[in-house]
């Protein structure tokens, strides 16, 4: 760039910063804060699949799946992890179904958790926006998008048609929220439900509620599914769960995490540590015996998990080693083409090799 252009650019940048404040425009290479801060989801497998060690601060996240697949459990695990880091969390319970006893079992400090049970969708989104603008809240969870009922629908008759009303409400909310969340570095998680499209002959008939705006504004979209039951004898004690990252703007998308959600306990962290440790040769498996650093830790996976639960320091060390090994900076490199392609991905339409 010649000298005159450089002077003109410097003057323009100076004028913009004077008018709109420092940091309103910058060179991309100068912004060292571009490294995204994340909060752990509570599942090591999912943190690794996300490629950044957790869900990103200052962004919108969508978690969707069928009923009883673990959507609310995942958000409560994340709230517990955020509270352990001293962060303030809010739960906007549009479904009016939050169980404080279950939340406490998962490690949530219910005395510090902010909870709102709004009457209308507009009220829920206004509360969400006010919390984001305050700059004092770090994580907001909205449960769920399907329960955000527009005021006109609540005040109308049961048979009235309100075509596109919820989608318009959400579209406007996304436009307002995105900038406020970024400025206050607050994460907003929307839990969503699945619906079936009528008359779809080919392709996946599943879709999420609330129109398309949320799909585009979300930096991360997670598809969570129950794949099987975990039994102790005849009693079912948990779910085998698969979580697919169908959109990711902070790392490479389309990765999957397979984990277990135990009833009343949340993620089976010790089981994940054992499985990933064996896979990456940090835990030795000989027959039914598991060993770590040359010491036998249990016969059978259940006993090895029990050992890690009784020795949290060893579990913490193994977790740290696995994160250092698997969360490489290369995983964070994402081309613009990949990010924009991820905007258009419909879950179920992802090639099997991913």
Curated annotation (Swiss-Prot):
Stored CDD domains: RecA
Keyword terms, alphabetized: ATP-binding, Cytoplasm, DNA damage, DNA recombination, DNA repair, DNA-binding, Nucleotide-binding, SOS response
SMART domains in UniProt: AAA
Keyword DNA-binding: yes
A Pfam cross-reference name: RecA_C
InterPro entries noted in UniProt: AAA+_ATPase, DNA_recomb/repair_RecA, DNA_recomb/repair_RecA_CS, P-loop_NTPase, RecA-like_C, RecA-like_N, RecA_ATP-bd, RecA_C_sf
Residue runs in coiled coils: none
Protein name from the UniProt record: Protein RecA
Source species: Vibrio cholerae serotype O1 (strain ATCC 39541 / Classical Ogawa 395 / O395)
Gene name linked to the record: recA
